[in-house]
């Protein structure tokens, strides 16, 4: 059995001087990042990752619309309630807002549901939040591709 030699690859997250990622100007990744927030997948399209962009667009938009069809509740920031309720409402609001234009258009067109008891409405609320959280992950991916930390 041959002796194993240590790998010559650097550990993930560490770079030698010769393999450090190049300095990328903010303008190179900020536009795709904002586009990725407004329209899910648009940042990937701008960075020429069309397959990934299409998959993200379909995933986030369908998840958001399933949440709407199930009459899920969109969170609004509430203060004055107990700490846990405020934390949940603010967290849900940030997740909903992260869906970008989907959330903005649904709010502009007057979509609002009262919080009702029932499993379907509860699942709808979870779908609306999940759409925003998926878009946050897509935005992180856009930033990593834009700064050339990932292909």
What is each of the regions a protein language model found here?
Residues 36-41:
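Hydrophobic, membrane-inserted alpha-helices
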């Amino acid at each position: 059995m041959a002796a194993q030699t240590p790998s010559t690859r650097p550990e993930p997250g560490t770079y030698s001087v010769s393999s450090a990622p190049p300095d990328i100007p903010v303008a190179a990744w900020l536009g795709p990042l904002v586009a990725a927030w407004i329209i899910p997948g648009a940042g990937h399209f701008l960075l020429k990752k069309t397959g990934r962009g299409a998959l993200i667009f379909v995933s986030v938009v369908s998840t958001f619309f399933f949440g709407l069809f199930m009459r899920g509740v969109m969170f609004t920031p509430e203060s004055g309630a107990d700490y846990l309720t405020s934390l949940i409402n603010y967290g849900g609001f940030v997740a909903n807002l992260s869906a970008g234009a989907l959330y903005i258009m649904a709010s502009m067109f007057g979509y609002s549901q009262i919080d009702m008891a029932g499993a379907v409405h509860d699942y709808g609320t979870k779908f609306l939040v999940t759409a925003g959280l998926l878009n946050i992950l897509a935005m992180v991916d856009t930033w990593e591709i834009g700064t050339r930390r990932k292909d």
